[in-house]
A protein has these predicted regions:
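Bacterial N-terminal signal peptides that target proteins for export
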Residues: 1-6
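Bacterial N-terminal signal peptides
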Residues: 8-16
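A structural "domain/chain start" motif
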Residues: 19-96, 192-197
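Envelope-exposed proteins and targeting segments
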Residues: 37-42, 85, 123-128, 144-151, ...
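Extracytoplasmic/secreted cell-surface and envelope-processing proteins
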Residues: 52-53, 99, 137-141
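Short secondary-structure boundary motifs at beta->alpha junctions and helix caps
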Residues: 62, 145-151, 155-197
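Stable alpha-helical elements in mature extracytoplasmic
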Residues: 69, 73, 77, 111-115, ...
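Short, solvent-exposed, polar/charged sequence segments at loop or secondary-structure edges
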Residues: 84-129, 133-136
Length: 197
């Protein structure tokens, strides 16, 4: 009986703690007057290698990672940066077609960290390179939680200098990871806009 009461109390405590939204957005800006010449930007597919092996894990609580998180976050970031209007942003289809014409994989170009080559192939002044640490849904029978944790850096393709970077980490109860990612990317770009202007 005492064991059952203990389990009930523990379950309630876990649910109460789990209902809290955790949110953190960090922006770092490293622009100087010579960086004002950056006019065109391309967002590369986010590196989602860290979450690819996490398709489904856990016994009681299942964590399901989205299989195309890298492309989804690149699309979201492209859309939000385009809405900002500060840069001319290449669409993801433009990025893909220019890279395909160069007969190389997008992931390989990003991994090589050859930003000058990316700039020449895409004909852009800067690229946004992102990495995903979490992008999924943790699910129990009576409880679900969306998780998004990623970083992004805007890198000058001529100098190799990081112009700005962002780190976002959010976890919210009963929130789909895609909806949560849209919200987080929008908030991060809004915060970036305030820091830059």
């Amino acid at each position: 009986m005492i064991r059952q009461i203990g389990l009930v109390i523990l379950s309630i405590a876990v649910l109460c703690v789990g209902c809290k939204t955790i949110s953190r957005i960090t922006i770092n800006v490293n622009l100087d007057s010579s960086d004002r010449s950056v006019k065109t930007l391309a967002v590369m597919r986010f590196d989602d290698e860290l979450i690819q092996d996490e398709a489904v894990k856990g016994l009681i609580m299942k964590t399901i990672s989205n299989p195309d998180a890298g492309e989804m976050l690149a699309d979201m970031m492209t859309d939000e940066l385009h809405r900002w209007g500060k840069y001319r942003i290449l669409s993801r289809s433009e990025v893909k077609s220019k890279i395909k014409a160069g007969d190389i994989k997008e992931e390989d170009l990003v991994k090589l960290k050859d930003y000058a080559a990316l700039g020449k192939i895409l004909k852009v002044d800067a690229v946004v390179i992102g990495k995903i640490y979490k992008f999924g849904l943790s699910d129990m029978t009576v409880y679900a939680r969306g998780n998004v944790y990623c970083t992004a850096e805007c890198i000058d393709t001529r100098k190799g200098k990081v112009l700005w970077s962002m780190e976002t980490n959010e976890s919210a109860p009963y929130k789909d990871e895609v909806d949560l990612a849209i919200k987080v990317v929008k908030e991060a770009v809004e915060k970036l806009k305030k820091e830059v202007e």
